[in-house]
């Protein structure tokens, strides 16, 4: 019985670890045509050219790729990032210790051995020649060589020369050029920057163009006699296939393979004229005049993906503070966390391979709303503290999650609770502003999507304190991408354009108890006429004349106004002292925000510029009492925190922070200002203006394989929804 169980266990182990690999990369056949080297999941393998069990040659945790055979087949050069960046290594072709040949901080990718086997040629962006007219970028590499025993690196060519293949004499070699920045994996690309095949004479320094085609021609190799060239091309309107031409008449091109749908990649040839390449993730060999043969590969490998741990105290992609100022919700690596504003206690709310985004708090601080792309579609989720005796998320023991308005087709994202917490606004299908009643689940449309053209995901919007209005960023008069600030009823209707500037205005938020909207605009600074370089100002648009007049009072007049209002309140208070205390229901009723007075007539005449000069602005807020503007601005390097007294019109540098972009939010009472950045978070007491760091510790377990699967699906769906249009493209996106 024990023997039987042992046999069953061994059989199970065999089926668990023996795999038929797919999507092998950087395939190259050995010079004698007996073996094939390739990269699979970041390691170098070799397999008999007739098929069989693959042998693993590298076992480092780093990424190894681009194996290149030496002319005698005894060594393999490859690239590895085991030292941080990709360096060049060489090792025995039967396995063994790898020797590092290069140590430059650039990434070095091998192309070929010289025919005498003494040097390895590689591409890297190290040093442009003094006479070079190329744009200085790492994408435009130079060609170098290094002795196989290590030593001084020499520049062969100062221009991009990739996928080198020597003839037997070593006097000439083929290469593919690179003229631009287009992604090398793009299919069906036709333009002036597509790659061409060239031949270089090492004796005379002459470059000869062998192909002049508007599409891609690349990865050229010589036949053993050096009289014919094989290469990959997307000619004839199809995918990459193998073509050939005589070296003396390169215009006489013949198709060698006729694969459809998928591209042929990674072409190489051996001394017996055997071609080797990949198609649809598998390896093929082909002899002249014979049909391609798939190489059967068995690969023994422990393919069980390990769960990885991530412990991070920075790197949040977004963050928001709870109304009471005691909790901060953040997203990090696509997961939602909540941390204490005063301690580093941090709770993970979600744990999925899919991305979560747009997290926000309910007014009672006990519910989170966010969007998640689980199941392949952006949907809204609510996470609630289950136990009434537990006051916050970081210390909660049970958190209940539910999907809101489940759908497999309609996308919903960027939620925001209404001020009373009874409704939730969100953006539907990336363009429409919608509201759902959380009790009845009834949905109403606020905007119809005709005023937003970007499919990137959403736009800025904000509830008014009384819950009856939205301010939002929108495109007026079809003037995309230049946005204006709008005002629309929370019940839906026509959007009122508050700015009409013709230049980009963004980031609207309600201030001064809802009597004004703060926003930033480039109307006075440098404008993005060439898609970059904007300088912005902070502006206010006032909802009513009374608020506008009060804001423009001098400091002296404003102080007199405050004294008068104080006396009026005291008189009103004396009259109510004789009355009985109101019950709790009445107290709650009194706490309800007052309706905002919106006077649309003349509203465009009630717009004020706050900042004294245009600058590279970040986030901005106005204090609860309306006296001070706080904003991020970058004058020297990164962002610093600035303060402006709105009565005195005085501006000063409050804190020299030299930080990246950060969001600024106040708690509901206006007692603390939160500076929420990716690399650091801080809290500023509004009285003392002292900064206190906020620490969090996000600990999560990552299923990297599941994350990669999600990322692939995400990109595929992005292409379907944001790029592909069957009316514009003749190819099937699902096949491409």
Show where each model-derived region lies.
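A short helix->beta-strand "capping" segment at the edge of beta-propeller domains
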Residues: 19-24, 54, 301-313, 397-402, ...
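A flexible loop/linker signature enriched in serine peptidases of the S9 family
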Residues: 19-21, 39-45, 58-64, 77-89, ...
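Beta-strand-rich domains and repeat architectures in extracellular enzymes and scaffolds
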Residues: 19-45, 316-334, 611-627
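Blade-terminus and WD-like Trp-Asp/Gly-His loop motifs, strongest in beta-propeller folds
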Residues: 28-33, 67-75, 111-119, 164-172, ...
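Predominantly a core beta-strand signature of beta-propeller blades
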Residues: 53-54, 96-99, 151-154, 196, ...
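Conserved blade-ending motifs and adjacent loop-strand segments that build the rim/top face
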Residues: 254-266, 496-507, 618, 655-664
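Long hydrophobic segments that form regular secondary structure
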Residues: 606, 612-649
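Conserved small/polar residues in nucleotide/adenosyl-binding loops
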Residues: 729-735
């Amino acid at each position: 019985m024990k023997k039987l169980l042992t046999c069953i266990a061994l059989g199970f182990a065999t089926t668990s670890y023996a795999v038929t690999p797919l999507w092998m990369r950087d395939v190259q056949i050995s010079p004698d045509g007996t073996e094939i080297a390739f990269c699979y999941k970041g390691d170098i393998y070799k397999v008999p050219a007739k098929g069989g069990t693959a042998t693993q040659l590298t076992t480092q945790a780093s990424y190894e790729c681009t194996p290149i055979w030496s002319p005698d087949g005894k060594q393999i050069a490859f690239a590895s990032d085991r030292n941080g960046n990709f360096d060049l290594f060489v090792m025995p072709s039967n396995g063994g210790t790898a020797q590092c040949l290069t140590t430059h901080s650039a990434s070095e990718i091998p192309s070929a051995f010289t025919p005498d086997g003494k040097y390895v040629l590689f591409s890297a962006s190290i040093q442009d020649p003094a006479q070079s007219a190329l744009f200085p970028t790492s994408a435009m590499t130079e060609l170098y060589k290094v002795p196989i025993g290590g030593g001084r690196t020499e520049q062969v060519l100062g221009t991009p020369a990739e996928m080198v293949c020597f003839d037997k004499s070593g006097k000439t070699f083929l290469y593919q050029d690179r003229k631009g920045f287009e992604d090398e994996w793009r299919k069906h690309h036709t333009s002036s920057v597509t790659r061409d095949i060239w031949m270089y004479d090492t004796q005379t320094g002459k470059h000869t163009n062998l192909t002049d085609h508007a599409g891609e021609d690349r990865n050229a190799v010589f036949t053993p006699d050096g009289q014919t060239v094989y290469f990959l091309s997307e000619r004839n309107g199809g995918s990459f296939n193998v073509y050939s031409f005589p070296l003396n008449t390169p215009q006489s091109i013949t198709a060698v393979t006729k694969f459809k749908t998928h591209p042929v990649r990674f072409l190489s040839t051996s001394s017996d004229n055997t071609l080797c390449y990949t198609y649809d993730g598998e390896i093929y060999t082909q002899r002249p005049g014979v049909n391609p043969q798939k190489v059967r590969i068995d690969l023994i490998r422990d393919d069980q993906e390990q769960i990885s741990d991530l412990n991070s105290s920075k790197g949040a992609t977004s963050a928001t503070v709870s109304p009471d100022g005691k909790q901060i919700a953040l997203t990090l690596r696509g997961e939602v966390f909540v941390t204490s504003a005063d301690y580093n206690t941090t709770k993970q709310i979600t744990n999925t391979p899919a991305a979560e985004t747009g997290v926000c708090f309910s007014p009672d601080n006990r519910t989170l709303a966010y969007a998640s792309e689980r199941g392949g579609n952006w949907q809204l989720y609510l996470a609630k503290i289950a136990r009434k005796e537990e006051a916050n998320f970081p210390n909660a023991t049970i958190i209940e999650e539910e999907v809101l308005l489940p759908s497999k087709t309609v996308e919903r994202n960027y939620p925001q609770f209404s001020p009373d917490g009874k409704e939730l606004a969100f953006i539907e299908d990336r363009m429409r502003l919608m509201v759902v009643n959380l009790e009845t689940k009834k949905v109403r449309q606020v905007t119809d999507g005709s005023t937003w053209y970007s499919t990137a995901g959403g736009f800025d919007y904000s509830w008014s304190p009384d819950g009856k209005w939205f301010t939002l960023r929108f495109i007026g008069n079809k003037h995309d991408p230049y946005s204006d600030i709008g005002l629309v009823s929370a019940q839906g209707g026509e959007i009122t354009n508050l700015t009409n500037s013709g230049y980009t205005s963004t980031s609207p938020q309600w201030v001064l108890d809802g009597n004004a909207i703060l926003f930033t605009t480039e109307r006075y600074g440098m404008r993005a006429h060439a898609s970059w370089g904007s300088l912005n100002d902070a502006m206010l648009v006032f909802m009513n004349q009374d608020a506008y007049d009060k804001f423009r009072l001098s400091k002296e007049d404003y102080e007199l106004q405050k004294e008068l209002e104080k006396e009026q309140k005291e008189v009103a208070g004396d009259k109510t002292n004789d009355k009985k205390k109101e019950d709790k229901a009445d107290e709650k009723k009194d706490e309800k925000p007052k309706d905002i007075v919106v006077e649309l007539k003349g509203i465009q005449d009630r717009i004020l510029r706050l900042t004294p000069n245009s600058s590279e602005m970040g986030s901005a807020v106005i204090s609860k009492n309306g006296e001070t503007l706080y904003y991020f601005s970058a004058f020297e390097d990164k962002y610093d925190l600035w303060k402006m007294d709105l009565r005195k019109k005085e501006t000063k540098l409050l804190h020299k922070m030299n930080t990246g972009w950060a969001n600024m939010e106040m708690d509901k009472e206006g007692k603390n200002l939160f500076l929420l950045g990716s690399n650091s978070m801080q809290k500023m007491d509004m009285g003392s203006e002292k900064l206190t760091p906020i620490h969090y510790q996000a600990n999560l377990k990552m299923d990297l394989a599941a994350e990669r699967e999600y990322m692939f699906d995400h990109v595929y769906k992005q292409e379907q929804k944001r790029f592909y249009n069957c009316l514009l493209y003749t190819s099937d996106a699902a096949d491409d």
